[in-house]
From Swiss-Prot:
Biological role: This protein binds to the 23S rRNA, and is important in its secondary structure. It is located near the subunit interface in the base of the L7/L12 stalk, and near the tRNA binding site of the peptidyltransferase center.
Name of the protein in its database record: Large ribosomal subunit protein uL6
One Gene Ontology term from the biological process aspect of the record: cytoplasmic translation
Family statement drawn from the similarity comment of this UniProt entry: Belongs to the universal ribosomal protein uL6 family.
A cellular component term, taken from the record's GO annotations: cytosolic large ribosomal subunit
Keyword rRNA-binding: yes
Matching Pfam families: Ribosomal_L6
Entry-linked Gene3D superfamilies: Ribosomal protein L6, alpha-beta domain
Subunit structure: Part of the 50S ribosomal subunit.
UniProt keyword terms in alphabetical order: Ribonucleoprotein, Ribosomal protein, RNA-binding, rRNA-binding
Amino acid sequence: MSRIAKAPVDVLSGVEVTIAGQEVTVKGKNGTLSRVFNDAVEVVQEENQLKASPREGVANGWAQAGTARSLLDAMVIGVSQGFEKKLQLNGVGYRAAAQGKKLNLTLGFSHPVAYEMPEGISVETPSQTEIVVKGADKQLVGQVAANIRGYRPPEPYKGKGVRYADEVVRRKEAKKK
């Protein structure tokens, strides 16, 4: 039995929720998010709370309800406050510059990397070695940050590369003769 599924999701002020069958749409100041949930889960709105509960006779209903509750919580927080991921560039000559919906990266390749931001994601560069990815969709923000990090993941010997701001890179010692 899922403990997560038993806790209701509080709908914050300024957030509007619409339930149509298995599709839940959440509107807020940061935009609109919509998701179709598994048939094993029933989503119900009671006053200012959303509840995800399993349908009768479904084997993995509580597990699906816990997942649905977490997704609903992320949707409500996303449209009201938004999510952000911070990245840092470590390395000689590694730079980032945001130009509208495009992020230009210089990561030691023979060519600059131009990363086009998907719809609903914004990017800022407070300095040349910092990147801040923002958006309402938690999954998409994380995926964009992972894609940017994937161009040059941090290496363990010198620590060069693109890393998350809170990431700790375990360093290795160089080979000795």
